[in-house]
């Protein structure tokens, strides 16, 4: 199976720019069969039926297979196959053919097979970890509605891996995770404006009474305030936090209150934090919206906020 995955991945990478629409359709059907066969095989899991961790050798084998599958899905979603359809089809048929040959369906079938296999054990492999979060960020940006339609268990696993990525020390993994979160939050924020379903039941409150977006907002704020080397993450973090704050106002206010209460015995610090939180959501002409101009404004606001908040909270 590992050899089949490797050959398929290499074939898609090498040939996708040179195919015509009919050949792209064939490749998609073939890759879907590979994904379905792999999913049915039960391979790639890093735990035995008894729940004990497998040997390091078995973990490495699972890593190689899952990474090959991720690479195949990444090549499929890169745009080369879509471009091949558009460029080879008659102009009046290109759009219809691109919709008919559902590349996203294959990629999401692959994600459905991969997500249950992505554990902390496999994410310890740097190359696989980066590959997974790069693909996740792309799919959440390009197809958030399809992500919202995932079964609850798959969506929950995906969110667990996203939380892992948001806390990861690797800068690339952190940035891709924040990009993925920003795409998901923007989808939910825009859905609320248009009164469409958005993430639907996936937004149900957890045991602490907060939604998944509010939970990840709190996690990200804590990382930005308390951990080292965060200013190189400000742009991606800001793009993720802005739509969450706009959609989760009460949760954001509760978060601000929690930070301020941590310095309640220092009136000067309370004033500094209160003013910083006000400026975060109002300075530089910040408006309601997640357009490009507003994102740039919020990036500046977040950088200024962190300068104050880290100075106040990290000295205690």
Language model region names:
Residues 1-316:
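Karyopherin-beta/Importin-beta family HEAT-repeat alpha-solenoid scaffold
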């Amino acid at each position: 199976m590992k050899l089949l995955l490797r050959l398929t991945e290499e074939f898609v990478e090498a040939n996708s720019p040179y195919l015509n629409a009919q050949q792209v359709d064939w490749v998609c059907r073939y890759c879907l069969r590979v994904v379905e066969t792999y999913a049915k095989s039960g391979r790639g899991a890093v735990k035995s039926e008894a729940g004990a961790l497998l040997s390091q050798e078995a973990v490495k084998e699972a890593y190689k297979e899952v990474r090959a599958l991720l690479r195949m899905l990444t090549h499929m979603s890169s745009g080369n196959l879509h471009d091949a359809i558009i460029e080879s089809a008659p102009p009046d048929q290109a759009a219809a053919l691109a919709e008919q040959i559902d590349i996203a369906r294959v990629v999401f079938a692959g994600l459905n097979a991969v997500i249950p296999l992505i554990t902390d054990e496999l994410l310890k492999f740097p190359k696989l970890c980066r590959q997974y979060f790069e693909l996740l960020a792309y799919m959440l940006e390009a197809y958030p509605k399809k992500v919202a339609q995932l079964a609850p268990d798959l969506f929950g696993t995906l969110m667990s891996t996203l939380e892992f990525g948001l806390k990861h020390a690797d800068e690339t993994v952190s940035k891709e995770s924040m990009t993925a979160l920003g795409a998901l939050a923007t989808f939910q924020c825009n859905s609320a404006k248009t009164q469409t379903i958005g993430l639907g039941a996936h937004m149900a409150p957890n045991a602490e009474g907060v939604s998944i977006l509010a939970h990840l907002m709190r996690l990200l704020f804590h990382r930005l305030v308390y951990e080292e080397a965060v200013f190189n993450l400000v742009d991606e973090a800001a793009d993720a936090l802005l739509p969450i704050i706009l959609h989760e106002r009460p949760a954001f206010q509760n978060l601000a209150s929690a930070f301020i209460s941590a310095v309640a015995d220092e009136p000067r610090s309370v004033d500094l934090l209160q003013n910083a939180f006000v400026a975060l959501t109002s300075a530089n002409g910040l408006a309601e919206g997640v357009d490009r101009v507003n994102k740039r404004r919020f990036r500046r606001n977040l950088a200024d906020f962190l300068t104050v908040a880290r100075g106040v909270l990290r000295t205690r």
